[in-house]
Design a protein with these regions (language model features):
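A short, highly charged nucleic-acid-interacting micro-segment common to nuclease
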Residues: 2-13, 122, 126
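Active-site recognition of the HExxH zinc-binding catalytic motif
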Residues: 90-103
Length: 150
């Protein structure tokens, strides 16, 4: 598969998203995939991807920023300048891995315990998801870490 910084069409995005859903063994999830040209507003700033889900019903929505030249460091004051370039395919993999992680320790099962995780533990989980997404990205596209640099 060729690396994709920005999807050319919604049709291309939907096809690839469904293919990756299948390859990650997430076929039992009902997922609505969407693209946006605007950074996604989250608490405390903006993001290039967002997943909302209900583990019990296995349903989710995944929204991906489809903008090649977005530099989140310019949009979010609390972020330092970044050397990583936005990549829609990487963002899609990252968001799908949020659902995959739910098979390991579902948030619904953690219940209130999820709130007891320290901010550092939450960041560590998210950092590891990003590392896994980058690893998968490089494996399926045949790229190396240089691809992510601006």
């Amino acid at each position: 598969m060729k690396p994709i910084r920005e999807f050319k069409s919604d049709e291309e995005f939907q096809k690839i998203a469904k293919d990756l859903q299948h390859k990650l063994f997430l076929d039992d999830w009902f997922i609505i995939f969407g693209l946006t040209d605007e950074p996604i507003r989250i608490s405390g700033g903006y993001s290039s991807g967002l997943t909302t889900f209900d583990y019990g019903n296995r349903e989710a929505t995944i929204l991906i920023l489809n903008k090649d030249n977005w530099d989140y460091s310019a949009d979010v004051a609390e972020y330092k300048p970044t050397v990583i370039k936005n990549c829609a395919l990487l963002n899609l993999l990252h968001e799908l891995l949020h659902l995959k992680r739910e098979y390991i320790v579902p948030s619904d099962i953690l219940g209130d315990g999820a709130d007891e995780l320290s901010e550092m533990e939450k960041k560590d989980v998210h950092t590891n998801l990003e590392k896994m997404a980058k690893t998968l990205f490089m494996m399926i596209t045949g790229t190396n870490t240089d691809y992510f640099l601006k």
